[in-house]
A protein has these predicted regions:
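Post-HExxH zinc-binding segment in Zn-dependent metallohydrolases
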Residues: 66-105
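Solvent-exposed, acidic/flexible segments
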Residues: 45-50, 70, 106-109, 113
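Pan-zinc metallopeptidase signature
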Residues: 92, 99-135
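Active-site recognition of the HExxH zinc-binding catalytic motif
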Residues: 50-63, 74, 78
Length: 135
């Protein structure tokens, strides 16, 4: 299946990953949770890892039942992407991707990322995670 069709989202550069979360409920308790992560094939290994990190951040939000507005969801998830690219300081791909993320005009993936990245720099991971539900 086409990843863009599956995600029902349009991005100028295309969709590189998507996460699906399904569950059943019995008396307000979630049971049988299922996560499915789709990732575009034939990517460079660093890009694959960055997309996987982004999608796993979505899983974190689902598992912890954290609801944020869309821009902050994608911004938070892009912190996983940022972490991967920063972990390859000698990679031209990582450097270029980080620059592109910093300039991204998209209100969710760009602006939301810059908001969350600034928060992370100011208060650190532990405090950011603890504060997520207040955004």
């Amino acid at each position: 299946r086409d990843l863009q069709e599956l995600s029902k989202t349009f991005l100028p550069d295309g969709i590189q990953g998507d996460t699906r979360y399904d569950y059943q409920k019995i008396r307000d308790k979630k049971i049988n949770e299922n996560f499915t992560i789709y990732i575009l094939s034939n990517q460079h290994e660093i890009n694959f890892r960055a997309v996987l990190a982004h999608e796993l951040m979505h899983v974190y939000l689902f598992v912890n039942n954290i609801s944020l507005r869309n821009s902050l969801v994608e911004g938070f998830c892009n912190l996983g992407t940022e972490h991967v690219y920063r972990s390859y300081p000698n990679s031209k791909i990582g450097q270029l991707k980080l620059k592109a993320m910093a300039k991204d005009k998209d209100p969710e993936y760009g602006k939301g990322y810059r908001i969350m990245s600034s928060e992370l720099k100011n208060i650190g991971w532990k405090n950011l995670i603890g504060k997520l539900e207040k955004y």
